[in-house]
Amino acid sequence: MLPNTGRLAGCTVFITGASRGIGKAIALKAAKDGANIVIAAKTAQPHPKLLGTIYTAAEEIEAVGGKALPCIVDVRDEQQISAAVEKAIKKFGGIDILVNNASAISLTNTLDTPTKRLDLMMNVNTRGTYLASKACIPYLKKSKVAHILNISPPLNLNPVWFKQHCAYTIAKYGMSMYVLGMAEEFKGEIAVNALWPKTAIHTAAMDMLGGPGIESQCRKVDIIADAAYSIFQKPKSFTGNFVIDENILKEEGIENFDVYAIKPGHPLQPDFFLDEYPEAVSKKVESTGAVPEFKEEKLQLQPKPRSGAVEETFRIVKDSLSDDVVKATQAIYLFELSGEDGGTWFLDLKSKGGNVGYGEPSDQADVVMSMTTDDFVKMFSGKLKPTMAFMSGKLKIKGNMALAIKLEKLMNQMNARL
């Protein structure tokens, strides 16, 4: 990992969304130098599912040598941002670094993204970044080490990611486009850059999106913190860059990236905003004996499932059912399959003993999954992770996401038989 140099001692770092996850990790890294940290986040009271508040983060920051100023800030509220900036100036005398980390996410396609969710992503990601930047810039311009760092992806017009997550992509790209504009607008005064991970990062949000077991495919938040720390030490002339965490750390001389892995040696889930991963990551994944299902369609030369593969899969699923499985799951799944051997199938894990069949279930489905027959067979045979299928757009899910995650556990039990 990247060692601390002490160069941020006395600097004031204003971080949105710093009560947990990536934001807190960046805060702790800077705090080890003796930096002042403004924790600008919403969570003042403990959340039932997400650990950490602005006050617990402040305790951790001060425990490693930093000074903390916890501020209740919803980045959608301009007055709350302004109030936090004023408190920071009053307590620390200035602001040297702004990290726009707060973000809202919904991995849904256009028709499945409610307007309320669209507004949330636009207001937190795009508008919130603008408001925080605007409030801090007058003070950043007075700093000798002024930086704005947006946690946002490089601009990539490949439609692969836009296709299934258009609203989220636009909201994040808004953050990235501020880098283009502000880097030029404040050239020579403030360095403005973006930082994004090469692979999935393990956070509470990733657990909610990916479900149990996703952490083994992720890196720790420490890699983003180290990459951000590297950027903070660069001169103002380093501006307008879209930095990938692994790349900048290689420039710092880091060679062993297993130290950042949750499960060293396990294949990592690549980030889909990037085009660079297919060949390099495929080779690494294949070397472990796994199947690199994240490849682009044009790179996939997988054979079609044999005739009747779907029916055979459901037969094996049915043989695997039991009262214990039904009791543990309590859900009805509907599969809308396209392609060869396509059609509508159901998996009833509510009725005694469970049941499968072709057509509609007798009761309303709790979860509807849409995919090709090829991908259905691969999922149930363990060659395609449901999380990867969902995030790459191969799998569409409607209904109860918690019950969808339960099905993944059942799939894991059946893999050996399929």
From Swiss-Prot:
UniProt KW Acetylation keyword: yes
Chief site of localization: other
Residue list for modification N6-acetyllysine: K116
Residues recorded with modification N6-succinyllysine: K318
Binding locations of NADP(+): G17, A18, S19, R20, G21, I22, G23, K42, D74, K172
Keyword check for DNA-binding: no
GO BP term, example: cholesterol homeostasis
Tissue: Ubiquitous.
GO MF entries: oxidoreductase activity
Transmembrane intervals: none
PROSITE patterns documented for this protein: ADH_SHORT
Keywords, comma-separated and alphabetical: Acetylation, Hydroxylation, Mitochondrion, NADP, Oxidoreductase, Peroxisome
Enzyme nomenclature, EC number: 1.-.-.-
Residues at the catalytic site: Y168 (proton acceptor)
Cellular localisation: Peroxisome; Mitochondrion
Location of the SCP2 domain: 306-415
GO CC annotations, alphabetized: membrane; mitochondrion; peroxisome
Family: Belongs to the short-chain dehydrogenases/reductases (SDR) family.
PANTHER family per the UniProt record, alphabetical: HYDROXYSTEROID DEHYDROGENASE-LIKE PROTEIN 2
Function: Has apparently no steroid dehydrogenase activity. Controls bile acid (BA) and lipid metabolism in response to nutritional cues.
Name of the molecule in the record: Hydroxysteroid dehydrogenase-like protein 2
The species this protein was found in: Homo sapiens (Human)
Gene: HSDL2
